[in-house]
């Protein structure tokens, strides 16, 4: 694993650096394999990043978009990660509908939806059960409790090591999420983290030793490249 940590002066610089990295990796992937695969994160931090991507002139037919996690709500619900990404980016560009690989959330059974999304991924990547295909980029955020995707502290989702997708849980509300072994299979994992409220969690995530189950972002140790992009408010006290 190659680990890089960058602290940017403010959120504007954070988004600009994130955009630059993604565009570089997109260009390389399309040149090498004819397509680019990316898993998106939710939350408020990446919205301006998605808006910036939408402003680019890109080969949209070669870009495939997935979600690292999704709240178990309808796609038009205000809390939907899919809706946020569509509003900020996907509905603004000429990307083929079949290139948007949204999480199914209308089965009234999160386990069924998780299995459907896993099957979809296996079909797309032509991977067998038990194999962990590699996305080009998995984009992640981190909460002030050190959760990432919908992998929350001391939850059952952290115990799942033989699946691509599982059911996460936040305050009794189910979510669909990548498992940490699937995230770790990615060619590049990019954390984009902003805000002073993240400092205590970051200190534990970067500590030489800590309780991984209490700070789930510690589980993210990809086979490929790990990039932490932080704004100054988040990274000011970090010793890296």
From Swiss-Prot:
Keywords: Heterocyst, Hydrolase. It catalyses: 6-phospho-D-glucono-1,5-lactone + H2O = 6-phospho-D-gluconate + H(+). InterPro entries: 6-phosphogluconolactonase_DevB, Glc/Gal-6P_isomerase, NagB/RpiA_transferase-like, PGLS. It holds the Pfam family Glucosamine_iso. Pathway: Carbohydrate degradation; pentose phosphate pathway; D-ribulose 5-phosphate from D-glucose 6-phosphate (oxidative stage): step 2/3. GO terms for biological process: carbohydrate metabolic process; heterocyst development; pentose-phosphate shunt. Its EC number is 3.1.1.31. GO terms for molecular function: 6-phosphogluconolactonase activity. It is an enzyme of class 3 (hydrolase). PANTHER family: 6-PHOSPHOGLUCONOLACTONASE. Hydrolysis of 6-phosphogluconolactone to 6-phosphogluconate. Belongs to the glucosamine/galactosamine-6-phosphate isomerase family. 6-phosphogluconolactonase subfamily. This is 6-phosphogluconolactonase. It comes from Nostoc sp. (strain PCC 7120 / SAG 25.82 / UTEX 2576). The lineage of its organism: Bacteria, Bacillati, Cyanobacteriota, Cyanophyceae, Nostocales.
